[in-house]
């Protein structure tokens, strides 16, 4: 069964690689998040099912299927876009597998039915088997591209070069309605490309967003979303999803998973300290927004241990990192 599932994983991976080749303008300035998800290059995301479901519903809209993620800096808005890509990629492979399984079951039943009814008159035939229907998830063909604003702007020395690059991306999106752009720091589209009387990126995108020729998931902080909302016509093209920092048990469970994930990445074991203890210390000494504050501390601690060629970190190492980050002696 594992080999069968691997077959559909490979087929979906090949489809995504081919998309990168077909849509050269888009792939040269973005990351294919679905492909990264299939390769296991995206970190797992926990307790964001509600936000992912809200985005999925908005992407299915006939008009203005565009989403604006807002929330405090560091609360995990980009991670939600990655969680959506992971969900879609897994959904597609699972559907392909279940659909093929239903087809195999039908073929087996049909062969048995043919053998049983081979010499019977029509009046005595038993009911023929019917293939089990496997409903296709509505978004399982969607592919999310994380657009790099720096790649879009860089190298545009002369008037019209920026517009040409942006139009190339938009044309790629028009060719395949399953393409969704993820734009981090989306409030910048109000000013990017504004020169010599040009309207900027937002003005170029606005008609295509309204006609659903392209689909966009944008992310920005609550404060900076006001910059985007200054253009009321542009803001109306988006449906807002508020992203709140995880708290309580959800934060603890997520912190524990993040700690294990980073320990695996750095090949470091964690001794005499728990994720809950680290989270309490981070909240008390550093503040900030979870999970960004928590990740900063454990990543710096573990990278320091790797630099020193150590195989483990503990309570003392966490305190040392916090002391360095805050400038205070933490006992």
Labelled PLM ranges:
Residues 2-331:
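AAA+ P-loop NTPase nucleotide-binding core of proteostasis motors
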């Amino acid at each position: 069964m594992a080999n069968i599932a691997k077959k559909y994983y490979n087929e979906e991976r090949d489809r995504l690689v081919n998309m990168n080749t077909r849509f050269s303008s888009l792939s040269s300035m973005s990351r294919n998040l679905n492909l990264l998800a299939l390769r296991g290059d995206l970190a797992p995301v926990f307790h964001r099912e509600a936000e992912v479901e809200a985005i999925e519903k908005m992407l299915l809209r006939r008009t203005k299927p565009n989403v604006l993620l807002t929330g405090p800096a560091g609360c995990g808005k980009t991670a939600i876009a990655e969680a959506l890509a992971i969900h879609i990629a897994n959904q597609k492979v699972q559907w392909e597998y279940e659909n093929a399984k239903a087809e195999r079951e039908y073929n087996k039943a049909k062969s048995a039915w043919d053998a049983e009814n081979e010499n019977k008159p029509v009046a005595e035939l038993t009911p023929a088997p019917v293939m089990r229907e496997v409903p296709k998830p509505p978004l399982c063909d969607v592919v999310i591209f994380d657009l790099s604003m720096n790649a879009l702007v860089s190298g545009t020395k002369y008037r019209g070069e920026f517009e040409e690059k942006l139009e190339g991306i938009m044309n790629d999106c028009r060719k395949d309605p399953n393409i969704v752009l993820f734009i981090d720091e989306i409030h910048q589209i109000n000013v990017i490309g504004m020169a010599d009387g040009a309207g900027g990126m937002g003005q170029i995108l606005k008609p295509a967003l309204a006609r659903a020729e392209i689909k966009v998931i944008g992310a920005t902080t609550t404060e900076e979303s006001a910059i985007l909302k200054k253009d009321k016509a542009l803001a109306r093209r988006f449906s807002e999803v508020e992203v709140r920092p995880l708290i309580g048990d959800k934060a603890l469970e997520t912190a524990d998973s993040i700690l294990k994930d980073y320990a695996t990445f750095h090949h470091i074991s964690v001794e005499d300290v728990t994720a809950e203890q680290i989270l309490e210390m981070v909240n008390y000494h550093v503040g900030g927004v979870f999970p960004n504050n928590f990740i900063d501390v454990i990543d710096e601690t573990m990278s320091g241990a790797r630099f020193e060629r150590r195989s483990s970190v503990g309570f003392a190492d966490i305190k040392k990192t916090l002391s360095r980050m805050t400038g205070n002696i933490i006992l």
